[in-house]
């Protein structure tokens, strides 16, 4: 089967698997009002997804070095469907929402990186970096659409239908992968080709892969903090300062910034290939840190200003997403690719778990929703990104084959 067809199959499946991914963040203001949630409780509902993802992804992704990633994907995407449909039909408060978000995290742990592993097993060499970027793009487009899709369906039929739609689409992803993607069992590694299932020591000795993975950890902290809270932040800014509610509704802005982020992610990888991956990532991190330190305070000035900065911030956050993941995949030894991706994903979504929770906790500690509290909450992300910058400077990861500035 051709490389193009493999990429198309996997990316199409990921679009359907991801279309409900941010339905809960999109409808978070509804849940906060309906269930009288504190900022910390809302953060836990969002963060539960990343908590279970982080706990299960080391095993699920490491297994892709031993069994066909397709088999893992199929079981996991069914869990994704169960989580969405269960949340839609059975959730009535914090604890039930928390449980179904935990299930959703396990589903995505077996869907995202195993899907990428299935793709990368068929696509080798310099084209692999582009395949990774297209995979990230398809996930990003669908994730972006999930904000507006969920909010629109919820406005027509109620929030439960807004959540359930993602579960139905996850079942379509199952059918696409089950019937269109060829099976491909990993080749035997031999006595010295593969470490134990959860022996990540060889991966941690790979300085380049580790640097990109640490950068991804803090990148995902930043990205998920924005995705989890952007609708709530803009809802506050709109209520405080007023604005154009028709064209610039909070859910619409969330979709626009996510779509712009997809473009930035794919384009960013191409720029990284031309000017040097490490150099590009450092420049992007510095820029996003600067925006993070001011964006929250704009909520009390102008809704249009806050919305515009959210779009700019989203572009900067996503700009190095594919570059970091492609850097990890391209730096991995072939027999350790699954384990390397497991470390990458575990570190990334550990940050992804803490980011939304930290935002909610800081909002509570700063006295609740106010321009000052939002300013401090976003500024903490800028401070955290300094650690990602430190990893890139100290570990000095190498560029990849096909990158022009080696």
Model-derived features with residue positions:
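Extracytoplasmic gate region of multi-pass secondary transporters
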Residues: 24-25, 209-255
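Conserved MFS/SLC helix-loop-helix module at the cytosolic interface between two early adjacent transmembrane helices
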Residues: 55-91
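Juxtamembrane intracellular "pre-TM" segments in multi-pass secondary transporters
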Residues: 184-213
